[in-house]
Amino acid sequence: GNDVTKLYPELETIKDIAKNNVLVLDGEIVAFKDGKPSFSELQKRSHLKDRNKILEMEKNVPVAFIAFDILYKNKDLTDRSLLERKKALDIISDTNYFIKTKIYQDGKKLFERVKKLGLEGIVAKKKNSIYIGKRVDYWVKIKNFKEEEFYVGGYILRKEKISFLLGEKKNGKLIYVGKVSIMKNDKLAQIIQEKEVENPFYNYKEAGHFLKPKYKLLVSYMERTTNNTLRQPFLKK
């Protein structure tokens, strides 16, 4: 992978937690907004190049490393069970920039809590599972998708797919929020038979085929970004 240490100078302090041990951890860098992980906030830092801007954003949008698992502590731990690896990880103390995830026994109750808090989701893992390093059926990501209906204001034709341009009406204007795609043989493809009109979107200026916004589609998505577009949208059927 890419070395992104220079983008997050505050995370350089994590090396102090090793205390002369050689560690390999599995986790992710997270930025927070209102006490919750925020993908949009992290995006403000993930592509910076100017050193002064990086240092400025370190203060304005601080990040932390969230540790999910430990793969190595002076020796390979990937063949140990999840519970054994968690014990090895728990010996390391949390700091302002290093936070360990916990194991919860009641997954259903935890997921209900996640939904109430508006968090992204959970990962369910078998307690005795070893670390494979790729997707496996005994590690399941359960995402907290939101659902909303959006107007179809147009479409883009691709080789085998149709990408619908989605919008929502605010103050009499159709505001573009993102795209969802279907295969050309999907029954919803009949929507593109409608008569084309001028671009109905207030904030979408790119090329496309435009329609009168009368059809609505039910769409699932993770969250809205800072520019109000949908993150990971897909058509709910």
Task: Give the label of every model feature segment.
Residues G1, Y97-Y202, E206-H209, K216-S220, ...:
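Nucleic-acid 5′ end/cap handling module spanning
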Residues G1-I92, K216-K236:
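Covalent nucleotidyltransferase
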